[in-house]
Amino acid sequence: LVRPILIKFLYLVAYIFPDNYIFGLQSGIFYFMKKKIALIAGGYSDEYIISLRSVQTIEKNLDGEIYDLYKIIINREDWYHETADGSQIQVDKNDFSLSLNGSKIHLDAAFIAIHGTPGEDGKLQGYLEMIGIPFTTCNSIVSALTFNKNFCNKVVQGYGDVNISKSVVLYKHTPFSLGSVLEHIKLHVFVKPNESGSSLGISKVTAAEQLLPAIDKAFKEDNQVLIEEFIEGRELTIGVYKIKGEIHCLPPTEIISKNEFFDYEAKYTTGVTDEVTPAHISEDILEQLNRKAKLVFQNLDCRGMVRIDFILEKSSNLLYFLEVNTMPGQSENSLIPQQVKAAGMDLKTFYGSMLAEIL
C-alpha cells in the first residue's frame, strides 16, 4: 500500500516542480537528481575579474538544494571546471561535459556571466545553441547585434518611439578625414570602441584638435570606432527581464559620475560614481522609460535579463537610447542586484526565475 502511494506522491512532486528535478528508481529506492547548472565566467576581455565577481554572487544566490552548480572558467588557453578545492577539471567541448570522479557529468543548462567576448558578443551562445544546451542570456544573433553599437542603433532607430543620437562609424583599415567626420556630426562628441564589453577607450571630445587622439585611443581597443553626438542630460539605466511571457522592468538607476563621464574608472572604482536606485524621476518619465525599454526588449527579442541605458536630455526632457547591455554585472554592488533589491525581490528568487525560464 505504501509503495503505490509513494509513487503517486513522487509523480505529483515531479508534476509541480518539473523544471528542477528528475527522479529515478535504483535498487527499489526512489531518488531525486538535481539539474546540473554550469555557471560560466572568465572571458577574454579586461572585465575578466568582474566576471568572476559576478559568478560569485550568482553562485551564492542559487539554491544548492535544488541545483548542482558547476563553475566553468573560460579563458584564451582553456575551459575548465573549478572545484571547491581549487582543482581544474577540463571541459569536453564536444558535448560540454565533465569527467568527475570517474563519472561523465552532462550539464543541463548554462548561467552565463562573461562580460565582453565570448560571452556577450554571441560566440559562446552560438556554441551552446549548436550542442543544444539552454542558457540564460539573449540568443547568439541578438547578443552579436547588441554588442555592435552601430548596428544596434540602426535597428532600434526603426522602432519609431525611440530617439537615437547622431553618429559616425569609422573602420581601422578604411581611410577617413576629420573634415568629413565633422561635416556629419558636430562637437561635442563621444568617441568609443564600437564593439566592447567594457568602458575602456572612451573619450569625450570638445575641440577639433582632440578628435584624432581620441580616435587613435579607441582604435587600440577595437577595429571599429563610433563617434556619437553628446547629449547633455541625466544618465538612466533600467533592468528588463522576461518571465512566463511577460516583460518586466526593474526600478531604474541614475548614474552620476564624478568624472566627466561614466568611464572604466567611474564604473569600477568605489566612490567615483553615485548610483541612485530608484532614480528620482517623475512618474511621467518613469512611464516613458519603462515603455521604451520594453519596446526595445520585445522588438530585439531579448531573453533573460538585460540592462538598457538612456540619456534624459536636459533641454528637451526627451529620452535618448544609448545601448543594450545583454550581460550586466552581477557583483553585489552592481546595478541589477541594486534594482532587484529596490523592487522588493531577493536575488535567490530572481536568479532562480531566470533558470526556470530555460529548464
Language-model-detected regions and their locations in the chain:
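Conserved metal-phosphate-binding beta-hairpin within the catalytic cores
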Residues: E229, F297-Q330, V340
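Active-site nucleotide/adenylate-binding loops and adjacent lid/helix of ATP-dependent enzymes
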Residues: K34-A41, S45, K104, L145-R234, ...
